[in-house]
Amino acid sequence: MAQAYWQCYPWLVLLCACAWSYPGPESLGREDVRDCSTNPPRLPVTAVNTTMRLAALRQQMEKSNLSAYIIPDTDAHMSEYIGKHDERRAWISGFTGSAGTAVVTKKKAAVWTDSRYWTQAERQMDCNWELHKEVSISSIVAWILAEVPDGENVGFDPFLFSVGSWENYDQELQDSNRHLLSITTNLVDVAWGSERPPVPSQPIYALPKEFTGSTWQEKVSAIRSYMQNHTMAPTGVLLSALDETAWLFNLRSSDIPYNPFFYSYTLLTDSSIRLFVNKSRFSLETLQYLNTNCTLPMCVQLEDYSQIRDGVKAYASGNVKILIGISYTTYGVYDVIPKEKLVTETYSPVMLIKAVKNSKEQALLKASHVRDAVAVIQYLVWLEKNVPKGTVDEFSGAEHIDQLRRNENFSSGPSFETISASGLNAALAHYSPTKELHRKLSLDEMYLVDSGGQYWDGTTDITRTVHWGTPTAFQKEAYTRVLMGNIDLSRLVFPAATSGRVVEAFARRALWEVGLNYGHGTGHGIGNFLCVHEWPVGFQYNNMAMAKGMFTSIEPGYYQDGEFGIRLEDVALVVEAKTKYPGTYLTFELVSFVPYDRNLIDVSLLSPEQLQYLNRYYQTIRENIGPELQRRQLLEEFAWLERHTEPLSASAPHTTSLASMWVASALAILSWSC
């Protein structure tokens, strides 16, 4: 899944309009977006009336002596996905996009979001709200300074601001004679009142031993060893990100959409383990698993989730040093630790250690990708049979592939909202259809599906782009060059400890050669039944260096404005490369096992090395997936796999019509049944 760090190109406004209402922006109509210039304003049926909500919030602001209140789009753990009861910005503004910041003053209210969501915001917000399209903190503060008089207060919830965000706001407001005030009671929650969704209370459970790479005791020992060997000699480490605690204790639940996490903090010290969580969610068996009935160094002491600030403050009053990873620590807990007792790093030791999978974790992740490939292949076969009938749309397609994954062993649902995008909608890297707004899949258009699953043994993420008709020469070239980029990076051999950003350009080279590019990241880490976007692995400037045992996605793409989109994403394991001469070098081993669309590959563009690599990959797919399909008696899917992994030849381009594929499939099945 391409991560959301697109540049804010103006053309995305038009693309958003297209995505919301096919066939194009001309059909969008003024009734589908708000028009605040008329009296009374004209609002679409999708707009949310926020008048009473704003009045309730402003009442709380007045009680706290605030002239402005900042409402970000995250939770107290800096999570990528947030639970319903944490959707504060969405509730107060009506705007449900995944990225954006709201600010409410005594008289005005405004939302800042990037170009992916401009049209959505105009559809969902009423005229109580201004929409701002420059999303920097500097832009937000400039607006605040224009609206808030000298000497007045700007409030924020310290548990919703990372340390870095707080520092940026504080710096921008310095010398402005406006005061940034930390209010630990969230005012939106108070205004929301009884209508706010409850905090999840599903059981927190321990993963069966066969699905874990190490015991929680072994992991605790590894973190303590890290602290002992640290030059700053920290006595404790504070874990704030939800996947950190889930990984450390091999515990899972379902508090967060698409992520098997539960609300918690961990304060791990050299002599104690303190888990801040809702204690009532543990069974007796899980309590015994955590050794909660003792106070020894390998016993877990359970404390109430809401007491994290007081608990950290009390521990920090002693002769201690606390290590934090500032990327996922909020100002709410950072603020109570005296600066002389802080040891700060970008990422916590848990983030660094879990990024490198041990041999058992590697085997588990690989196994999950085999089953996942079966589900994706079943989906592609289903599409080939049903798209010509005109019965498949983007939304029904997304529902079908999600269900195919749920049918697999050890499934725990999708790992993110499936991106099912046809034609011009695929030009939006993060487009997802809805039951109300979607397009039919067509033989005459490209179709992109980016999807993934959560399984007890691993998390998956894969993207394939297909065309069932006759693609244009440009579409074939663009697709092939995206494939070339995927191959070039996947087969690369590079020195150990190389940063991902150093090699990232290999995925773009084939596109750059002809003046093409893509605006999202090239890859991200992936977890063992954890995050689909697992930091700090990847190809960005702030990712850690590549190391043997890491898993990363490799996902170049190309997006033609208003016409089509292409992305080819595989998950790869970083392994030691076999080189002619001695040295420690690394390369990638793909663990995604679904063939690319032969109908879109221009073999003449591939170098001999690229073609050889592709055919070798296809042979690997046959070896890993073929037996599984045969074991399950999925004969139609097996025939499809055999056809789509036939070796490609430089002398003869391979394109196969739907009709010929159906005939071949029927003959293959008939021959097996005779």
Swiss-Prot record:
Residues 651-674 form a propeptide. It is found in: Cell membrane. Optimum pH is 7.0 for bradykinin. Active between pH 6.0-11.0. Its cofactor is Zn(2+). A lipid is attached at A650 (GPI-anchor amidated alanine). It comes from the Eukaryota. It catalyses: Release of any N-terminal amino acid, including proline, that is linked to proline, even from a dipeptide or tripeptide. InterPro entries: Creatin/AminoP/Spt16_N (IPR029149), Creatinase/aminopeptidase-like (IPR036005), Creatinase_N (IPR000587), Pept_M24 (IPR000994), Pept_M24B (IPR033740), Peptidase_M24_C (IPR032416), Peptidase_M24B_aminopep-P_CS (IPR001131), X-Pro_aminopeptidase_P (IPR050422). Homotrimer. It is a lipid-anchor; GPI-anchor. Inhibited by the chelating agents 1,10-phenanthroline and EDTA. Inhibited by the thiol-containing compounds 2-mercaptoethanol and dithiothreitol. Also inhibited by apstatin, captopril and p-(ch1oromercuri)benzenesulfonic acid. Weakly inhibited by D,L-2-mercaptomethyl-3-guanidinoethylthiopropanoic acid and N-[l-(R,S)-carboxy-(2-phenylethyl)]-Ala-Ala-Phe-p-aminobenzoate. Inhibited by ramiprilat and enalaprilat, in a Mn(2+)-dependent manner. Metal ions have a complex substrate- and concentration-dependent effect on activity. Transmembrane segments: none annotated. Membrane-bound metalloprotease which catalyzes the removal of a penultimate prolyl residue from the N-termini of peptides, such as Arg-Pro-Pro. May play a role in the metabolism of the vasodilator bradykinin. Keywords: Aminopeptidase, Cell membrane, Glycoprotein, GPI-anchor, Hydrolase, Lipoprotein, Membrane, Metal-binding, Protease, Signal, Zinc. GO terms for molecular function: metal ion binding; metalloaminopeptidase activity. This is Xaa-Pro aminopeptidase 2. One of its GO terms (cellular component) is side of membrane. N-glycosylated. Expressed strongly in lung, liver and heart, and at lower levels in kidney, testis, brain, spleen and skeletal muscle. Its EC number is 3.4.11.9. PANTHER family: XAA-PRO AMINOPEPTIDASE 1, XAA-PRO AMINOPEPTIDASE 2.
